[in-house]
Regions:
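Active-site neighborhood of HAD-like aspartate-dependent phosphohydrolases
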Residues: 1-52
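C-terminal cap/substrate-recognition subdomain and adjoining C-terminal extension
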Residues: 2-4, 75, 82-236
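Short, compositionally biased "basic patch" segments
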Residues: 44-70, 134-139
Length: 236
């Protein structure tokens, strides 16, 4: 197997948090009650501080999809991608991913955000693999507002990556030893400790301290340059 290049999404390749931005997007368009603004901001702050639990963080954002199917949410997701997400994707992020693609690495996006919300962003970057939090559905295919399976956050990111490697028949230890993982967040410390080459990207204060103490590389992306042109040019 080629080397793994693992990438977090929110505040790493994306400037901002996709699920926090999703709630703001829906509230601005009257699709969610604006009373959720305080809860949204509180979870965002506590996530960055590393004090929000995976369950409360992931379940809150899963609740925003409750009662509708993927097909019903699709137009909203497309508008969100166009209006909010794409302008927040720095050209430097595409260049970083392209560097690993050209090196022949296996590109994996691993994120605490829900698969449904972020799969368009993964496609935008040309990721072949996506590990994300899964949304539960009922018998009719509508989202229940709950999550399903292991949450892809903190220790769950390590568990889900182990499962993904096992499904592919790949030995876990050598794959992780050769892997690079990019993240901004202290919440990703378990996976950063598990790989051979952790890289802190515009790290939050707690991760910056860890990176300094452990002499990990620190990367500062040029976030002033968005990628509003033809993103296909970044996938070659």
């Amino acid at each position: 197997m080629s080397r793994l290049a693992l990438f977090d999404l929110d505040n790493t390749l994306l400037t901002g948090d996709s699920e926090v931005l999703w709630v703001e997007f829906l509230m601005a368009r009257g699709q969610l009650d604006c009373s959720l603004a305080e809860r949204n901001a509180d979870l965002d702050q506590r996530y960055h501080a590393g004090t929000a639990t995976p369950a409360e963080f992931c379940e809150f954002f899963a609740s925003t999809f409750a009662g509708s199917s993927a097909d019903e949410w699709a137009p909203w997701r497309e508008a969100f991608m166009h209006d909010v997400i794409r302008p927040r994707l720095p050209a430097a992020a595409f260049a970083l991913v392209r560097q690993h693609r050209e090196a022949g690495d296996v590109l994996v996006r691993t994120t605490a955000s829900s698969r449904f919300l972020v799969e368009l962003t993964a496609r935008e970057f040309g990721f072949g693999h996506l590990i994300a939090t899964e949304l539960a559905t009922d018998a009719s295919g509508r989202f229940t507002g709950r999550t399903s399976g292991t949450l892809n956050m903190r220790d769950g990111k390590v568990t889900r990556l182990h499962d993904w490697l096992a499904e592919r028949g790949e030995p876990v230890a050598p794959a992780l030893a050769a892997a690079t993982f990019y993240s901004d967040s202290i919440n990703d410390l378990p996976l950063m400790l598990a790989v051979g080459r952790p890289v802190a990207v515009d790290p939050d204060p707690r991760l910056a301290l860890e990176a300094s103490a452990r002499q990990w590389p620190v990367l500062n992306l040029d976030r002033l340059r968005s990628n509003n042109n033809n993103n296909n040019n970044n996938k070659t």
